[in-house]
Amino acid sequence: MKKNEFVSLCYHYIRPKKELDEFPKLLGTDIQQFTDHLKMLEGNYEFISTRDVFEILNQSSYSLNNPGMLITFDDGLSDHFEASKILEKFGIKGTFFIPSCVTENNLPANPIIIHYSIAKFGIKKFLSEYELALKKFNLLNEKN
């Protein structure tokens, strides 16, 4: 990578260690792994903000000493509060994308509901309940 190029690394779930996690089957990055990622990345990349990205893309006089790394988080999860404290310790600005359903309706995004349901009940139970719901609302194509 050239020095004024950048990549973006997106995180979703930043979880406690499996043995302490209420949802151990939820696929994600544990807090220690996240911290280790940042330590590894800081030696090879220059952490940048969305403002920096704007400057780079608009070919201003902005200059990076190393390739840039933008750290982002999707879905507006409570996990990200813990991640923000870690970012602050490293002096890194993260970009957090929060779905409008979280702020307007106080509800998680649909994929989050699915992920937690599968983590709690398993895929077979989830699919069984999903099929029942499809039948209840006449959404199941009987040919399938």
Feature-to-residue mapping (PLM):
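Terminal accessory/targeting
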Residues: 1-71, 77-144
